[in-house]
A protein has these predicted regions:
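An alpha-helical, amphipathic repeat domain used for nucleic-acid recognition
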Residues: 1-117
Length: 117
């Protein structure tokens, strides 16, 4: 597979055309991290890796956006992400990063919920 073109789409999102037929939309960070540019040859494994990274980034950013408005328990956030992204593996990896960075903490969530009562 060959990347035919990479064009700015909206904001920090780029439209990447593969083999002049398939379009995917990637964040500028993914473009830079995976050296995505016109003329690059990709095998199926490399494309899957890029798409996985893009989906992971989207899901993680979505979770951070949701956490701006209120706290979520692990189960609530996992189910919210699963409803949108449909991949248990992806949602599990996002939850692992959220908990390791301290954004999701069931103990803290329970303590705050108890204080509200």
């Amino acid at each position: 597979m060959k990347i035919t073109s990479v064009k700015k789409y909206k904001g920090t999102t780029y439209e990447v055309v593969i083999d002049e037929e398939r379009k995917i939309y990637l964040h500028a960070d993914i473009i830079a991290d995976y050296s995505v540019f016109a003329g690059t040859e990709l095998d199926t494994a490399a494309l899957r890796k890029i798409i996985w990274a893009s989906n992971f980034r989207r899901a993680y950013q979505r979770a951070l956006f949701l956490l701006d408005y209120r706290d979520y328990s692990y189960a609530e956030m996992y189910n919210k992400l699963l409803g949108t992204y449909k991949s248990e593996r992806l949602c599990g990896e996002v939850m692992k990063k959220l908990t390791s960075n301290g954004f999701i903490d069931d103990r803290r969530y329970a303590e705050r919920a108890a204080r509200k009562l």
